[in-house]
């Protein structure tokens, strides 16, 4: 595919080492799409409820959102090779301890305790994007690379839930999160070993200045949009498991989630290959508006096939939002703070997933899965409202 300005996806891999870090990053990113939904599925299989699993998944996601910017800040100071293996090891061990606690029926509070350090999982997407920036910073290929990364994210959310939910349903309840912990270690160690493409450590800046990055109004607004997106993701995951269970077809959740991500990946490939002439803020407003509209039909889903189709349609709005948000972030922040800034946007998604998973779990337990989609619709409205504010601010400036 060749974009109007961005270049072809194939050209990205002309640089030595690009394919290797992209592959390692894919493996290391799979767990973020596996652990949360795997926890929900695990408890649905073991206990038949979603409140505890949703709450534990929310603790993991919220911990991830809080801890991962600290990991990225350490990476900016000490380098990926020195930081990533330790962070991944702590996360994997904590996840394994949580699963062991489930297996041996320890008090629930200890599961939540383990869920906190499990969130030390590095933001691999930010690490890979930093490597692309090192290769193609200041060139049109960088936006194409960011588009590719958005698609890779979605492929992870196709493969990850399929593996996690499928294994937890077909093998044993803890199988999905267990595989996620293993892949996290393998992928992260492989990425850290690729030293030739590792971005160099940037000179230290003033500590006070580094803590104030969210004082940039546009970046803070982008993070809020990402929080709303995270709520949508949390609802989509949990409600899919609940809806298909209500329809006596729990394994079908994997197909619905896969098609949601497929829709996003498809639109991402198309959108990323054609760099439009309109301002990024306008593109963000249009993309979030599209998402808000496409989420509404989920309230009318009456069967698993219908839900699956609606998931694909709604998913088509996701990647354009993520691509534009990352590109806009790259444009507005200092180059030596790109990894941290991208991580904050990812952290926003994590906060949203935590809130969305917990809230929709409670809503579903009190009503039904269909009602849970109201949470997603409300979040879509929040996203487009905030994106509209970003666009208006940009025009006034």
Functional labels for PLM-detected ranges:
Residues 107, 169-182, 362-380:
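A membrane-interface helix-boundary motif in multi-pass transporters
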Residues 89-105, 290-302:
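C-terminal ends and interior cores of transmembrane alpha-helices
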